[in-house]
């Protein structure tokens, strides 16, 4: 593109690395889209195309981590123009990394799509672990934080008229997408767990270990305060 002098000014400069990362991100968010970045200042050129979409995105984010399950991904389009795509994978770390997008725009503060995802994720996994007997007598029900420990996830929604909390679009507030994300995540994740018992066991074990560690830490704090 040719930048506008009126918008960018005479002393405009473009950071190659910033453009590289954003175009790579867009290729993950739009499966099959081919993007070429050519920097005529130094001759650098990069081609971006992801046939795997969000599944490849999650694999990329976890490339330096030891993963627990194969990437889980689904895409659901509704009759009223909304679409939900999600991919997730657990690794053996203790940090959560969940990225949220609306119409290819990143929301650093999440919003209604993230809220629906978290609710469905916790409910689906706790119901599964209870039904399959992973939770033993005396075990506390794992919290949302326990469930998301070591989770890498990407949520991408498409909305015809999205609403955000501010002009920077850092948080999605469109309430109509929350039940769609929640319903579809619960359904597809439950199917994945039932169809992949080996990986489901690995995920359940990590979550229960996180829950027990949290409870042990709480009891240790209480003992310290009593002394």
Residue ranges, per PLM feature:
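GHKL-family ATPase ATP-binding module
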Residues: 1-227
């Amino acid at each position: 593109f040719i930048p506008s002098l009126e918008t960018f000014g005479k002393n405009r400069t473009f950071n190659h690395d910033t453009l590289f990362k954003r175009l790579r991100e867009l290729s993950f968010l739009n499966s099959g889209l081919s993007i070429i970045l050519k920097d005529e200042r130094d001759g650098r050129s990069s081609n971006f195309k992801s046939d795997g979409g969000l599944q490849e995105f999650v694999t990329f984010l976890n490339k330096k981590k030891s993963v627990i399950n194969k990437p889980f991904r689904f895409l659901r389009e509704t009759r009223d123009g909304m679409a939900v795509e999600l991919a997730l994978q657990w690794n053996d770390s203790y940090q959560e990394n969940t990225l949220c997008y609306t119409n290819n725009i990143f929301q650093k503060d999440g919003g209604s799509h993230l809220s629906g995802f978290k609710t469905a994720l916790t409910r689906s996994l706790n119901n599964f672990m209870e039904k399959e007997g992973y939770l033993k007598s005396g075990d506390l029900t794992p919290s949302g934080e326990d469930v998301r420990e070591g989770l890498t996830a990407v949520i991408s929604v498409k909305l015809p008229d999205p609403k955000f909390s501010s002009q920077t679009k850092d948080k999605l507030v469109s309430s109509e997408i929350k039940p769609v994300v929640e319903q579809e995540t619960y359904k597809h994740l439950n199917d994945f767990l039932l169809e992949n018992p080996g990986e489901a066991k690995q995920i359940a074990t990590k979550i229960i270990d996180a829950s027990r560690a949290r409870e042990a830490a709480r009891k240790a704090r209480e003992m310290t305060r009593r002394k």
